[in-house]
Amino acid sequence: MTVSKLLKERVRYAPYLAKVKTPEELIPLFKNGQYLGWSGFTGVGTPKAVPDALIKHVEDNNLQGKLRFNLFVGASAGPEENKWAEHDMIIRRAPHQVGKPIAKAINNGKIQFFDKHLSMFPQDLTYGYYTRDRTDGKILDYMIIEATAIKEDGSIVPGPSVGGSPEFISVSDKVIIEVNTATPSFEGVHDIDMPVNPPHRVPYPYTKVDQKIGVDSIPVDPERVIAIVESKTRDQVGPNTPSDDMSKAIAGNLIEFFRNEVKHGRLPENLLPLQSGIGNIANAVIEGLTDANFKHLNVWTEVLQDSFLDLFENGSLDYATATSIRLTEPGFERVFKNWDFYKSRLCLRSQVVSNNPELIRRLGVIAMNTPVEADIYAHANSTNVNGSRMLNGLGGSADFLRNAKLSIMHCPAARPTKVDPTGISSIVPMVSHVDQTEHDLDVLVTDQGLADLRGLSPRERAREIINKCAHPDYKPLLQDYLDRAEHYATKHGCLHEPHMLKNAFKFHTNLAEKGTMKVESWDPVE
């Protein structure tokens, strides 16, 4: 087939040009039940041409539910995985996903989904943990990776994310490379550490955010590369949810806390490397830092969003490391127009490095993430609404919160329901699912205030959280629950972390029955 001029410029390893194929030519390779790896992380850097061709093949041949795959991606993929879910093309999915169609299929039982700490998922895949039932000794049948260039040695230059690609390539039987000529080359931004399994590992040597010690592309055996496909579709990232009064209040509470920590010598004036999740609260915190007059900040995180660009451009942020740059189209345009400036201040690493517990602890990262709910003793639920309905997955929040110097969770004090504008309290007596334990969190913050939990006993934590974080509509209810639980526990000699199990989930059951967590009374306990 004819090779475009753009593709020839991007593919600098000549033997690969003989392997250029159309996506349609690859369709016969894919069989029901295969194990596939995709590149990508938080919806950027994912393959597009081959997954889209498979969707069309399924549509044209009425193969919905008949051509299904076990799909592994570093985190969430792009819109293609949601189309796969709509066409019943996914048997199993891990470890994180975003989108209504795939979440619906998971919660309807059509897709077997499991989430895992993102620092651990790629390495556990290489151990063969997720393919134990295979009888052919393989782990992945095909790895489909998006590249923005291929170097002279055949190695792969990824795009705006690295994710689990190095590990997936290392255990894939065959590799398909989609070279995206619609996206500028990201060559020079990456720092790749290839996987080494125990007992031959050595420590990651990074002691500063801006250190680069690995290689700037992903090595691959050219013999395993079976096809080069040109892709001409850019990543599609929707607009960020704008900050509102609630998220700005949370950001204000956090920034006041940081200033106080600096004042008392517990943080340096430029803080410590920051990790921030995604969403409007995370964006508001970063926007707040833009105006807070902190200088020479550094970032060690999973995902960079548009809000970080203002920090760079006003001189507050010196350097940022992540495994994904998840920018809107205007955000990418800002970066590409000033590429030399950003290239010298950005590093993209694999997720096993960006989320590595040893490095997070060594660097003293300040971790900030958003839960579904937290309870009065500081356990947090990040994944399952009412204990059962999966949202997206654990992601990397626990990688950071367990190991950070400061572990912070932020959320609105209350959320609306159809019948009550404050029908859901984010602070509950007992969370309906536990992702982060009371041992992981240092600080809980809502739009109502900030609870500093360091060094407090469970009952002290409960009062701090109720007084500082709970919505006024729920403070009396939560305090009444705690008082009654303490009365019960005093009689039974279990006062360390008192609960009334009979009432522990009454907020949730009341919500299911009446559309609000505002319980009218507690059931009596003896």
Curated annotation (Swiss-Prot):
InterPro entries given in the database record: AcetylCoA_hyd_C, AcetylCoA_hyd_C_sf, ActCoA_hydro, ActCoA_hydro_N, NagB/RpiA_transferase-like
This protein's record includes keyword Coiled coil: no
GO biological process: acetate metabolic process
GO cellular component terms, A-Z: cytosol; mitochondrion
Domain of life per record: Eukaryota
The protein's Enzyme Commission number: 3.1.2.1
Catalytic activity: acetyl-CoA + H2O = acetate + CoA + H(+)
Keyword terms of this UniProt record: Cytoplasm, Hydrolase
First-tier enzyme category under EC: hydrolase
One Pfam family cited in the UniProt record for this chain: AcetylCoA_hydro
Keyword Lipid metabolism in record: no
Signal peptide range: none
Residues annotated as the enzyme's active site: E302
Subcellular location, record wording: Cytoplasm
Residue positions binding CoA: G277, I278, G279, N280, I281, N392, G396
A Gene Ontology molecular function term of the record: acetate CoA-transferase activity
Family classification: Belongs to the acetyl-CoA hydrolase/transferase family.
Physiological role: Presumably involved in regulating the intracellular acetyl-CoA pool for fatty acid and cholesterol synthesis and fatty acid oxidation.
Annotated protein name in UniProt: Acetyl-CoA hydrolase
UniProt source species: Candida glabrata (strain ATCC 2001 / BCRC 20586 / JCM 3761 / NBRC 0622 / NRRL Y-65 / CBS 138) (Yeast)
